[in-house]
Every structure is written in C-alpha cells, then in structure tokens.
C-alpha cells in the first residue's frame, strides 16, 4: 500500500519537474526520497533527528542528490525555505493533531501551485482543508494502509484557484 501512496503522489507532482517541492513532516523521508529518485528537487523537513539521519543515509546509499534534509519543526523551517525560493508543491503528512495555525499560515503565504495533504485523521484533515482558502480539491483517495483495522490514510490533491476560476 505504501508504494500505491507514493505512486499516487508522484503522479500528482508530475508537473513539478525542476521546481521545488517541500515534504513537511517527512519522517524518514519515504515520500521525499521516492520523488527525488525520480529527479524531483525536494526539501524534506522533520523534527525527529533519528528519522532525518535515516533519510540522509538512505539518500547517500541510493545515490540521491536532489533532496535536502532539514532537521527541526515545520514551523521553524518552512518560513525560511519559502523566503528563499518559490515552492511549487507543498506535501504535508502531519501527526494526528493536524497542522498548527502557523503551518497553515506559511502554506497560504507560500502560494504553492499545489498542496498534497496526507492524513491519518479525518477530523483534523477536514478542519485543515477548510482553512486552506484559495485551494480546491482536485482529487482525493482513501488508502487502507493498515488492513483489518479501522485506520486509513487519506491523500488529498489540492490546486491553487486561479483568479479566472473565482
């Protein structure tokens, strides 16, 4: 099921060739490394240092050089990244509590062309989607990552609403 999720995200970010993608709450870098291995420029942000060490080691072992790893909170690093470069795609896979208000604010300030939100909690997903003004759901998929349990992952592909669409 993990490969299914990664392929889905890869299809959604296909238009991001040579453009910056942020993978926020990246964990050990699964999504970031999957995309970087296909030539995409990815900046992975994760607070848990051992996970970032694993991601760096995986990148080195697999000869992946188009992925940058930032250890620290999304609240800390995302504003710094968007102040330096235009972000085409923002991928967020937050913990069950969802995104903080400051992360939503940073997302909206960066005005990426697309946002991909992966969530394990339908309640916080709904709350956060409502706060992402200026974006429209383009596709949504439910993935049963943990068969025989009540847990699901929901992947949502949002595109920026262009002024002509308003």
Predicted features and spans:
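Rossmann-like S-adenosyl-L-methionine
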Residues: 1-166
